[in-house]
């Protein structure tokens, strides 16, 4: 079948604008006169078709759950929601953002793919009435009434929870003095909360499809927000021994009960039962293999429970964001408070160490003068009051917020997770009931979805860990508060504060556990871990230390008698020195053991501390038996060696047991007092307590738990995996063969569209069974084009079958061509601009002025190749093709064509006639780079000049056919303009205009096809006046 091309004005009111950036993607809104533009730098611009600015934003700084901000991501695809309220923007990093069209704010973000998303497609679900499906259950069901009632109940079950999430931080702003959300966090939470009403009106009953450009996958997002299913194209084709060559387009249709995608494959010739719309047979249609273009339909069951699941997924991500922001706020304010607490114990000098001061004060009741001065004046009563204030005011506030804000967020996550799993289980039961009528008669109850799905199990475990860590954080706050309270009580009773000690101080001392306070001071105020270990061994492990020392002495053959003799000789030498110094007798008993200790060790080659483990580390040869009393030789330092630089100054103390909860791993201080989970009920809780008590989970910080939970939340499509984590096999409901000829090698472009889009609600096709939800497949090669309509057999009533087949045949197109020359429409020929030999109509007696207009602009009037197809509604098409000119060296030009009428055609011949735009305003043609068509008001927009300019024009709803039925336009002659000029002079009194100048202007206007403006009066009246 051939088609023809006429040249006429199909694009009116063309306006060209310069874009603020190079456009990478664009789309029209189906409900408004809006156009959205995206750039490679992440900018999105929304304008009216009149080019009035609405808003501009950048989505690179918006992150989804489980992702980071990527400054180098570009906007790869755009698509408006069916009602035009939201704009879906996909990035090159696989993130989909939903933007509010009215405000330009990002309302929802989800990680949908691993790499670049190449295309988006957002459709409405158009279901048949429920009563029309009852006949399916009347053949093989034992109890029809029970099944019908069960299905009706499943269809009409109300949502069990429609409450809105209360903002916890709003209450904290009123009565919380320490921790508050920032304004940016508050705004982020408010704008990302999608209300139930908004969800019902705009997102429910919609399916958003996205293609992963790298992995050849289709991601199905229920309600545009919930990545419910992932269709692996390669795995799906592998079921039929096909390999993917090219993926063209995708489309969701509720009439076919699934997601359709169009692809060119290579493999056996399938026996497609496309008339019945059933899966192909096991045996191939013929021997051998070849290249085929096939339409695959993957089954997707839709139920009301699935929409509730999508709403629960939104609530789940909102709860995650609320917890993350609450944790960040709590962490930031906690760090400020703990720094203030530690600053109270800073002595500001290295000579006085608060740990040594407190330890000496506890053991001996006194310390040196500098230490007492710090306790009395540096810390003082004000310092103790601040510590007590922190322990009695700030710590309870932290506990309250941790238990209130964080615990509320954690419990909300647990609740939303439970509701999410419940809605999924309800949906799974519906599918099982729909596919298997023996469900009601099984003796064994079916396994819950959460028990058989590894993704749901992981989600439950991560949220439970987060809830447990939140509870532990509150317990750690209480523990720290008690420790600081005991510390303040003890310090207040030390010597520097004895003057203010009250009478009941002794009673307080009796109630205090001195051993625990001593251990607390050693572990928190001594920064060196080796020193802490040494002191703990001396104070609390003396028996063990003595036993080890005795054992070591036996192994080293330590001679105690020889050691005592040596001590005596050293003492004698020192005694003689003292006698010589004071010239008087000196009693040996007056010598203090502490004075002898350094002298004793000075005589030894290897000084030994009898209270440490150093004696146990000596060699077998005992140094105590050596008689050499000389000083040990010191190793000379090599000149090239530099002294080791001193490390960072260690903090005076570390009292924080809570701060590590905000990190990825808990500190040793937090683990020391970390409580254990009760394992009493593990028999009914699937050993939850024992899992929580494992070392790996105990060491986890909340930040790491959040990262793991984010990774789980960002991959809900794994819900279709089995227990082993492998993707379940998807069911292909039918395969439709488009082309399978021996010479076929694929198409240049292919599109799937609805014959009657959802916004054409009053079209007659909606009243005809089968045609209202039919789809159209349009494919083209360089020199071929075809378009077919596929009707869902389940929608066609027997009495309408012949009528439907007649409509399908009339909508079918199939063209082949080599070259097609463009013809001029008759109506356009009457109004065409004058050419070189026919510039204007003149009287025989009038003088003609020839004006040189320069080189003639080439006209591209020969179609040599097709490149793109844009299906509209009811058989209308817009094609993008490459045209050549008769002039040499002009190359090719990409131009658009449009079918001149839609179905049903008033004139049958108009079906195969396309119109190419003719510029009546004299403007030159521009090569089209990217073309989009408005689906309702049929505006056209195309990019040119490397995406830096955009042209928008109005397309006529229907181009006049070739037959001339419009009134012929009367063109003015040169004499008419001369008469108008004379009358203008008489009326205005202007006589200085050059006649030649005016004649040149008239000639240029007529050559360009334009009429000069006048005062609206006709020239016939002017002639009558002259007579």
UniProtKB/Swiss-Prot annotation:
Residues 625-647, 1014-1027 have a biased composition (Acidic residues). Signal peptide: none annotated. GO terms for cellular component: anaphase-promoting complex; nuclear periphery. WD repeats lie at residues 18-65, 70-109. Residues 619-655, 1005-1027 are annotated as: Disordered. Pathway: Protein modification; protein ubiquitination. GO terms for biological process: anaphase-promoting complex-dependent catabolic process; anterior/posterior axis specification, embryo; asymmetric cell division; metaphase/anaphase transition of meiosis I; negative regulation of gene expression; neurotransmitter transport; polarity specification of anterior/posterior axis; protein K11-linked ubiquitination. It holds the Pfam family ANAPC4_WD40. Keywords: Cell cycle, Cell division, Developmental protein, Meiosis, Mitosis, Neurotransmitter transport, Repeat, Transport, Ubl conjugation pathway, WD repeat. The C-terminus is specifically required for completion of oocyte meiotic divisions. The APC/C is probably composed of at least 12 subunits: apc-2, apc-10, apc-11, cdc-26, emb-1, emb-27, emb-30, mat-1, mat-2, mat-3, such-1 and gfi-3. Probable component of the anaphase promoting complex/cyclosome (APC/C), a cell cycle-regulated E3 ubiquitin ligase that controls progression through mitosis and the G1 phase of the cell cycle. The APC/C complex acts by mediating ubiquitination and subsequent degradation of target proteins. Developmental role in early embryogenesis and the metaphase to anaphase transition in oocyte and spermatocyte meiosis and mitosis in somatic and germ cells. Required for embryonic anterior-posterior axis formation. Negatively regulates ify-1 protein levels during meiosis I. Belongs to the APC4 family. This is Abnormal embryogenesis protein 30. It comes from Caenorhabditis elegans.
